[in-house]
Amino acid sequence: MEQQSQLERLGLFDARVPRYTSYPTAPHFTPAVGEPVFRDWIAAIPAGAAISLYMHVPFCRRLCWFCACRTQGTQSDEPVRAYAKALLAELDMLKSALAPGVRLSRLHWGGGTPTLMPAEMMRLVAGAVLDAFPLAEGAEFSVEIDPNEIDEARMDALAEAGLNRASIGVQDFDPEIQKIIGREQSFEVTKRAVDMIRDRGIASLNADILYGLPHQDPHRIAESVQKLLALSPDRVALYGYAHVPWMAKRQVMIPSEALPDPHGRLRLFETARELFLADGYDEIGIDHFARPGDGLARAQKAGLLRRNFQGYTDDRAEVLVGLGASSISRFPQGYAQNAPATGAHLARIRDGRFSTTRGHAFSAEDRWRSRMIEALMCDFEIRAEEFIRDHGFDAESLSRILTPVAAHFGDMVDADASGLRITPRGRPLTRMIARMFDGYDMAASGHSAAI
């Protein structure tokens, strides 16, 4: 109860803060980064480099009301085929713009619903990608799989293409909650998809589950987590549902009065967290869990965990190139985002141009602030040695930045000459502590609840 009172006093239950999957966050991107800048950054990638590639497929058969992703519904394959054709054209432009010998350390298909593509289309797209950019040794090819939109033929196509990590969205297994959030997907349908994945020898399975959904209570989320544990995923993301109907209009379908209050959200998170830990998962960052042998767990132990748009990653590539509408690329120089609207993106590609419409070029200050935020989000610690060595700080200048944070959060953090650490009892405040290192105006955009 004392911890709850402290968390409340520090504003956890009222705050809205970024998830910090990037810094600066996407609302601060500007049109100053367009296609010419994107081409310059692509040209700077050295020959033979290993990069990551993300391909966005923005289509779904149905629109889930809880989802805030850039997606659109279609009952026909024709828009998907036209989009896949544009992906191939964009891929060809990218290959022409890059130095020779570039390989992939990670290939990820997300959406939307990538498994909406028919099997022959999957083979065509995967073949084109791997012809252009072979997989590096130890590379990971992952795809977001909708259990409602997968069959044997499509799973065969993915397995033959080299899929070695599958990701499925669960959200919640309670039928009443599923109906309210517009995502009906039974445990049996989900298990069938998992069995198809395992039967083909696909080594790793990710799953997403949400807390903070309408009518969720500790008993209901415990039942959903126990069903998920029966499927034995290697990695789990336990995300807080972000109710932002002013940004994601479809969320108006979800009754806000049925949502748990912030104290209830924390109880839901803690209930699920305790079950994952009891089942032998390692806790990764603020909201992920992984089997001890999973790459995320190994990266965390080695101090190599990183933050990206999917949450947490063990990918060490310096460049992530995003293909498709709304995709965001990350370079050592900054971020570049494609046109969010599918039509605008396709028009640019048809004209033989990349669709980069906005982004952000890093300043020196962005770099150290970004690294401090990432260090807190991944390791719950800012090490003074790193920032003195890599970012030009001395002990006094670093202390001027860390001391006010330590004073504000009291015994939720420890601070001394070696740096600043978030204590275990302070970890629910991690995003709020990270916000203290954010140099941008929080009022410029809306964000999700801090818990």
Swiss-Prot record:
Pathway involvement? Porphyrin-containing compound metabolism; protoporphyrin-IX biosynthesis; protoporphyrinogen-IX from coproporphyrinogen-III (AdoMet route): step 1/1
Q: Could you tell me which PROSITE patterns the record lists for this protein? A: RADICAL_SAM (PS51918)
Q: Which UniProt keywords apply?
A: 4Fe-4S, Cytoplasm, Iron, Iron-sulfur, Metal-binding, Oxidoreductase, Porphyrin biosynthesis, S-adenosyl-L-methionine
Example GO molecular function: coproporphyrinogen oxidase activity
UniProt GO cellular component terms:
cytoplasm
Top enzyme class of this protein? Answer: oxidoreductase
Where, by residue number, does S-adenosyl-L-methionine 2 bind?
66, 112-113, 171, 183, 208, 242
Q: Where is the Radical SAM core domain?
A: 45-278
Q: Which SUPFAM superfamilies match?
A: Radical SAM enzymes
Which residues are listed for [4Fe-4S] cluster binding in this entry? Answer: 60, 64, 67
Which subcellular locations apply to this protein? Answer: Cytoplasm
A biological process (GO) of this protein is: protoporphyrinogen IX biosynthetic process
Q: Where is the signal peptide?
A: none
Cofactor binding remark = Binds 1 [4Fe-4S] cluster. The cluster is coordinated with 3 cysteines and an exchangeable S-adenosyl-L-methionine.
Q: Which cofactor does it need?
A: [4Fe-4S] cluster
Q: Subunit structure of this entry?
A: Monomer.
Outline what the protein does: Involved in the heme biosynthesis. Catalyzes the anaerobic oxidative decarboxylation of propionate groups of rings A and B of coproporphyrinogen III to yield the vinyl groups in protoporphyrinogen IX.
**Family in the record:** Belongs to the anaerobic coproporphyrinogen-III oxidase family.
Name of the protein in its database record? Oxygen-independent coproporphyrinogen III oxidase
Which organism does this sequence originate in?
A: Paracoccus denitrificans (strain Pd 1222)
